[in-house]
Design a protein with these regions (language model features):
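Conserved class I S-adenosyl-L-methionine
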Residues: 264, 291-309
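A short glycine-rich, Lys/Arg-flanked "PGG" loop and its adjoining helix->strand segment in the class I
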Residues: 278-293
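N-terminal accessory segments
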Residues: 1-194, 210-217, 295
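A short acidic, Gly/Pro-enriched loop at the edge of an enzyme's catalytic core
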Residues: 252-265
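Class I SAM-dependent methyltransferase SAM/SAH-binding core
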Residues: 190-194, 198-253
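A short SAM/SAH-binding and catalytic strip from SAM-dependent methyltransferases
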Residues: 262-278
Length: 309
């Protein structure tokens, strides 16, 4: 079912243009990361070099942003914009100055052409324009993601773009297929779905639509009651939905959940928050009933633009 859903979506997009768009967004992110070092007066020309300490002192990332900035250095090296000389402990520049504005014009054109999601591109543009403040800790991206307690750009990131909607459709098709088989094998018994780390409910509506008519018990969980409160209002018309606090990094039973209490566990973009993935998977397995399914969505490639924040 998931493969069929994927094939249907693929037939509706221009794969070459979408690849170009993703590549340009990655390149724009690399340009923006490098510009923060150049704005600080380092690595201005091809062949110029600086140590990590010199770069950190010049850019001066905020205390909570140093880890992020080191990820930028790794991304710049992986993209070939910088080369690390291990013998001398220096990062050396391998690319010249580039025009981010010109790259962005093409990104906007392709984004519109492929219906990528204008709100997501707007979010990325805001992040790029505030990158200096962000890396110094003067700008919190959550102010854009959740303005005044609303979801804002969060929906653009997790649901309202072609990549997220495609992934959500594929996961939902798989869950619908599992629920259908469950009903045939267990007539009259509801299929128990537990969504872990459901957050803004980016995937939930797709699952509800795909399983329409199925007999379900749906437990919507997150670590924050903020998201649960929003979900209670959004899904109030579904009496078979319930809500609970759940942390993937804590023991299932100690949090008040019974072993073998789920037939399907859905983890949409949450497993990367695991402190120890083996422990988390073992923990989730406790909750799964025999023959149960774990359905998860996770990126398998780290995109440069996703590392901006």
């Amino acid at each position: 079912a998931a493969i069929r859903a994927c094939e249907k979506i693929e037939s509706q997009i221009d794969r070459d243009k979408l690849r170009e768009l993703m590549s340009l967004m990655d390149e724009a992110a690399i340009q923006a990361m490098l510009s923060q070092i150049r704005d600080a007066g380092l690595l201005l020309e091809v062949g110029s070099c600086a140590s990590e300490r010199q770069i950190l002192d010049a850019v001066n990332p905020g205390p909570e942003r140093k880890r992020l900035f080191r990820r930028w250095l790794d991304a710049l090296e992986a993209a070939g914009a910088l080369a690390y000389d291990a013998e001398n402990g220096l990062y050396c520049c391998r690319v010249g100055q580039t025009d981010i504005a010109k790259s962005w014009e093409r990104i906007e054109f392709l984004g519109d052409n492929q219906s990528y999601g204008p709100a997501l591109l707007d979010f990325m543009r805001i992040c790029l324009s505030r990158l200096g403040d962000l890396i110094k800790g003067r700008f919190d991206v959550r102010s854009v993601m959740f303005p005044e307690g609303e979801f804002g750009a969060a929906r653009a990131v997790y649901s309202d773009n072609i990549v997220a909607s495609t992934a959500n459709s594929i996961a939902s098709a798989a869950i619908a297929n599992i629920a259908e088989k469950f009903e045939k094998e267990h007539p009259g018994i509801p299929c128990r779905i537990v969504e872990v780390g459901a957050g803004i409910a980016g995937t939930t509506p797709s699952v509800i639509e795909a399983t329409r008519g199925a007999r379900l018990e749906y437990l919507f969980t997150d670590v924050s009651d903020f998201f649960l409160s929003k979900a209670r209002e959004t899904f109030k018309e579904y009496p078979w939905m319930s809500y609970g606090i759940f942390d993937i990094n804590e023991d299932v039973v100690e949090q008040g959940y019974l072993p073998s209490s789920a037939d399907i566990i859905l983890c949409a973009n949450v497993l990367h928050n695991a402190r120890n993935i083996s422990s988390v998977l073992s923990n989730l397995r406790k909750m799964l009933a025999p023959g149960g399914w774990l359905v998860f969505l996770e990126p398998i490639r780290r995109r440069n633009y996703s590392q901006l924040v």
